[in-house]
Amino acid sequence: MQVFNTLGKRLQSFEPHEPNTVKMYVCGPTVYDEVHIGHGRTFVAFDAMSRYLRVKGYNVVRVQNITDIDDKIINKARELGKSWNEVSEYYSKSYLEHIGALKVKIDMHPKVTTHIKEIIDFVQRLIDSGHAYVANGSVYFDVDTYPGYGELSNVKKEEWDQGEEIVKEKRHPYDFALWKAYKPGEPYWESPWGKGRPGWHIECSTMSTRYLGTKIDIHGGGMDLVFPHHENERAQTESLTGSTWVKYWMHVAFLTIRKEKMSKSKGNIVPLKEALSKYGPSTLRYWFLSSQYRNPIEYSEEILEQSSRSLQRLKDAISVLRKIIQKGPAHYAKEEDVKVQEEIVRAISRFDEHMENDFDTSNALTSIHEIASIVFSKLQYSEDVFGALIALDGFRKFNEVFAVMDEEFSAELDRLTKVIDAVIEVRNYLRKKQMYDLSDQIRDILSRSGVKILDSKEGSTWRFQ
């Protein structure tokens, strides 16, 4: 399996630090407004990665933070005439509600304001180790103490313009704030350097190491976070640990509208809650994953409507398979049936091959539509129950990653289980009659469709492989 590492800009073999565990940290939103479909695309992309890794047998631990104190939150509170924590609490709840609707699975949602003590400790250790300094109640990271600065983003530190307001109190114009000194009317916490609040970048370093340790397998987010956020995170964390912190840096490409990047400044933001209301979670997930995560994805009503039609085609294929299976029982496989079954198995294998090539959901989706084409062109005119079972299992594997047909499979899995139980009963009967050629053929066909038979003296049981 290969993934693209932003650090080095190349594909690398995926080998997590621990053989059976993947530690993943994804930067979550700053909750000063509704999350938009660009956020949704990023979160669903990493969700599909997590789901596929779990299918592969990994124990995935995914942490995604919530930045609930920031300049933008303070400004929004002033604009609305509310307190900063009212604003952050409202938008935090909205964010959690809507990514829940998108079926994004996240193990932990740490908030900045519940980790102030840990952040202060992290900053103090950077000061003690000579990587940070205090200036007028603020604390800055001394970028010159980290030789690897710029390796992730290929941005030269001298080119980083942070504005002129606080440059004078810094050693270098490109040093960045770890702790911001208190300003009248702003929230604050007590610290060894006086009243203040955390800088942006220190938050993620603190919370990621708090829950995942100093060796993280995947750290990700949108492409816009490569610089300065992830560059600064890497600098401050590795300065403290003295070793490589993140093994694979992964970033999701921009979402565009009429070929322009979606942004507040252009006024073309589409809130996630509006898109969910209009198209539903399954169509949105399908659309998000129809493009490989490193490729930009275009938003338009026409494209979303096409995604809805394409998803419906897959659901229609499942309906055809259900009818074939309900015809049962399975008959002795004809030669032409075996060829169709092998064709379906190859398409399922291609799905895995594409997912193992840097989570290429776009081509993986093409493989699933190939199965649908086989269903409509060949299977629906046959009585090939085994072929239908193989195809249905392919759709099941697809849905474990894409999560766009949960409704079909909650009922369909129950039906599938009953059908397989019936097939196993027939096979047990054949074995008792010593008709081993037929019983072996059933075993082999089920094995190709992902069903493992466990034989014993008492009979046979089964499980999905």
UniProtKB/Swiss-Prot annotation:
InterPro entries: Cys-tRNA-ligase (IPR015803), Cys-tRNA-synt_Ia_DALR (IPR015273), Cys-tRNA/MSH_ligase (IPR024909), Rossmann-like_a/b/a_fold (IPR014729), tRNA-synt_1_cat_dom (IPR032678), tRNAsynth_Ia_anticodon-bd (IPR009080). Its EC number is 6.1.1.16. SMART domains: DALR_2 (SM00840). A motif ('HIGH' region) lies at residues 29-39. SUPFAM superfamilies: Anticodon-binding domain of a subclass of class I aminoacyl-tRNA synthetases, Nucleotidylyl transferase. Binds 1 zinc ion per subunit. Its cofactor is Zn(2+). It comes from the Archaea. Keywords: Aminoacyl-tRNA synthetase, ATP-binding, Cytoplasm, Ligase, Metal-binding, Nucleotide-binding, Protein biosynthesis, Zinc. One of its GO terms (molecular function) is ATP binding. ATP binds at K264. GO terms for cellular component: cytoplasm. Transmembrane segments: none annotated. Disulfide bonds: none annotated. Belongs to the class-I aminoacyl-tRNA synthetase family. This is Cysteine--tRNA ligase. It comes from Metallosphaera sedula (strain ATCC 51363 / DSM 5348 / JCM 9185 / NBRC 15509 / TH2).
